[in-house]
Amino acid sequence: MVFLKSLSIYMENKPKIAVFGGGSWATAIVKMLSENLDEIGWYMRSVYVLEHIKRNQRNPNYLSSVEFETEKLILSNDINEMVEYADYLIVAIPSAFLQKELDKLTVSLKGKIIFSAIKGIVPESSYIVGEHFHEKYNIPYKDIGVITGPCHAEEVALERLSYLTIASRDEIKAKYIADNLASSYIKTKTSDDIIGTEYAAVLKNIYAIAAGIAHGLGYGDNFQSVLMSNSIREMKRFIKKVHKMKRNINNTAYLGDLLVTGYSVFSRNRMFGNMIGKGYTVKSAMLEMSMVAEGYYATKSAYKLNQKNGAQTPIIDIIYGILYEGKDPKKQFEILVEIID
């Protein structure tokens, strides 16, 4: 009853929420929030896109079928202005570009509540996003949260039934975000495993690249099922090394998110891997794609981190060799076939 009373008071005060990022996932999050809130902050770099949204109620680059009620949107390309506006900052900027955006900050993040919707590792620090804000900006872990799937932005745009896990060590904060994202087509649940869920969101992108490479090389569904089975076991070993706590790796935030990213036609990481399997170089595959494949950057950071931790990660090792050491995908998967079971 104490929790419910506290949450009720919290909801009455309606802390302000802002989304940072202009990509497909940021756009989907703004759509979800707009189902419940009368006012949402939205920061992105592009003045052109902001002006287009104001005039046409749509993001011209991502999920352009989604029509926004622009009277609900507080739009800005000034990151400091948006940080000052909001109590909750939902960060959905690709990890490769996050620090460049944060370098623009002149205002303090003290007292702000940060929820990461980024499925990647920050290259400059090799931290997951929550750790990065904690270590580099002194944000206490009680003010850090994670938004994870299984949930593709494209299906949010189509209003297909989707599921989100909202993780925070403070249940009131997790519930506040969960309630404001929930709708008839979005089901939400909360968790206190901020480290495990975020690492799972990072690792599943690497395994999706593996699934894509396998498909590009001509491996069928039978092998894909074995690959995904081995991927979830590898994920469990990796996460146990970085953060020991009791967790059910078969829950949707871990296994569910892995499966949708590994199998879906909407998965940019699987698409990236598929191109590698078909013979594209890493550089040409990245140039061909209009969206960032977070798994490319995550592979290097996860591989380096595991050199210290020593978990058994043959899939990550193979993908690292292909992406960063120029090893032949066909030969590397012939090796992988003999390792996994």
Question: What is the role of each PLM region?
Answer:
Residues 7, 211-215, 240-341:
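NAD(P)-dependent Rossmann-like dehydrogenase/reductase catalytic/cofactor-binding core
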Residues 7-66, 72-77:
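NAD(P)+-binding Rossmann beta1-loop-alpha1 motif at the extreme N-terminus of oxidoreductases
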Residues 70, 74, 79-159, 177-179:
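Rossmann-like NAD(P)(H) cofactor-binding subdomain of soluble oxidoreductases
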Residues 121-220:
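Rossmann-fold dinucleotide-binding core
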Residues 159-164, 195-240, 251-271:
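Active-site-proximal catalytic alpha-helix in oxidoreductases
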